[in-house]
């Protein structure tokens, strides 16, 4: 059973304490009524993982944990088998006591693009919206963050996060809650808010930007990463039924249009930090994610287009400040 009590105790003593007015009831409702049919199977995999205290832990350059003495072949096999019970692994990679989880996405590449443009994360309280398995939260902790809170309603991601946390010595500096941004009150409590790979899934992208702003302290920093297309400040793609085989893609703006959207929502000091084409080296099928990936979503005769004929995925990172 995944227990959120440690998180409640933690925030009871800091500037997130007002969240306790609503959060425990939301989590109790989720536990009672909304759990996935496979959740018990996934949470059992977490429970059966060994308790290990890492001798060497690197969260600055990767997410790597090592023991003082090498684990036995049987111990490694146990960890690998239990972690494979939590497939598919989409965001990573993780290197845990000789078990190398080669995830669909090289999320470390995204972090390397984003990190140089961030304000110093040392001592910051961070919210990561749509955090997936929590890979980037661990990198935030490695960069000096005091606390990283992730929200993502996908329950497999929660179990993946808890599995990694257990193998990192039950590290309590990062926490994942099975909630969507729309379930959060306007906390106005986070120094930095990340939204990476979420905006294009929202039916109302400006509402999403307002929701992100409501989580920031004054002078707080927003880090927004999303799909974009080429064009001027008036260019926005509204795909038909699917984009790169994804059904739930609603709006893909140009980076300049996105900058205007942020301005309209009251953000300042808005800058386009990076624009990069997503490659089949960064997103691909692996032993830990065996179904279709980016190569299957692109036109086989023109990799500059999706199978639907739209421009192939390109992603931008924008940084902005809440005044």
UniProtKB/Swiss-Prot annotation:
It is an enzyme of class 2 (transferase). It comes from the Bacteria. Its EC number is 2.5.1.-. It catalyses: carboxy-S-adenosyl-L-methionine + 5-hydroxyuridine(34) in tRNA = 5-carboxymethoxyuridine(34) in tRNA + S-adenosyl-L-homocysteine + H(+). InterPro entries: CmoB, Mo5U34_MeTrfas-like, SAM-dependent_MTases_sf. GO terms for biological process: tRNA wobble uridine modification. GO terms for molecular function: methyltransferase activity; transferase activity, transferring alkyl or aryl (other than methyl) groups. Keywords: Transferase, tRNA processing. Catalyzes carboxymethyl transfer from carboxy-S-adenosyl-L-methionine (Cx-SAM) to 5-hydroxyuridine (ho5U) to form 5-carboxymethoxyuridine (cmo5U) at position 34 in tRNAs. NCBIfam families: PRK15068.1, tRNA 5-methoxyuridine(34)/uridine 5-oxyacetic acid(34) synthase CmoB. This is tRNA U34 carboxymethyltransferase. It comes from Escherichia coli O6:H1 (strain CFT073 / ATCC 700928 / UPEC).
